[in-house]
Amino acid sequence: MFKLSDVKFKDVIYIKELHIPPKTTTCIIGESGSGKSTLIKLLNHLISCDQGEVTFQGKPIVNIDPIKLRRQVIMVPQVPVTFEGTIQDNLLIGLAFAEKPQVDQEKLKEVLRIVHLSKPLDTNADQLSGGEKQRLSLARALLLDPEVFIFDEPTSALDEQTEDKVIEGVIREIKNNHKTLIMVTHSQKIANTYGEFIAVMKAGNIIEVKGAG
C-alpha cells in the first residue's frame, strides 16, 4: 500500500526501503527523536521528502491531490484536536469536512462505546480530560471509515488498563472492516500484541521490520 524508497528528510530520517502492506496493522516503535512522527507525516504528505519517493497504492504521493489523500488516509495526532461544541458536534464535524453523509445518534453512541468514552452526546467537549479527548478523536476517525488510519501515540494520556481496552476495541473495528492501520506507539506490549508488522526506528533509520515473514 505504502512504499518508501531511498527517502530522506532533512537530517531527521533516511529510509532505504519500507513497504507497508494493505489491510494489516503496522506498529512503529523507537526511542524519542528516532523519526517516528516524521515518517507518518511523510505518509500523509504533511511534509515532502527531500530525496527518494513515497508511493501510495502504486502512485507517487506527490502526484495525489492532498485533500483526496487525506480523506483516504486519516491521521489521529497525539495531541487531540477538538472543536467548540458538544461531543456530537465534534463527531459530526469530521463527516462534514469529509463531505460524507451525516449519521444518527445510535451510530455516534456506537463509536463512543468502541473507544470506551462513557459520556452523553451533549457533553461540552471542553469539559473532557486529555484522555477523553484522545478517545473522542479516535471515535471521529472511526466514523470517517477511511482506507488507512494513522495513529501517533493515540492513547498516551490513558492509564494502561484503559489504554488496553481502547486499543483492543479500535483495532478490532478496523480489522473487521478490512482497513489498514499504521500506529506509532510507546508500548512494546501493544506492538507485540497487535502489530502484524513492527518497524523499529533508530536515529532516523528503519533498523528492523519484524513479522514480515
Segments the model singles out, each with a brief description of its role:
Residues 149-153:
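Catalytic Walker B motif of ABC-type/P-loop ATPase nucleotide-binding domains
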Residues 44:
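Helix-to-loop junction immediately C-terminal to a conserved catalytic motif
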Residues 103-120:
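Conserved ABC ATPase "signature" region
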Residues 160-162:
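Helix N-cap at the start of a conserved alpha-helix in ABC-type nucleotide-binding domains
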Residues 80-89:
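Conserved catalytic motifs of ABC-family nucleotide-binding domains
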Residues 52-60, 69:
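Conserved ABC transporter NBD signature motif
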Residues 124-128, 132:
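Conserved ABC ATPase signature
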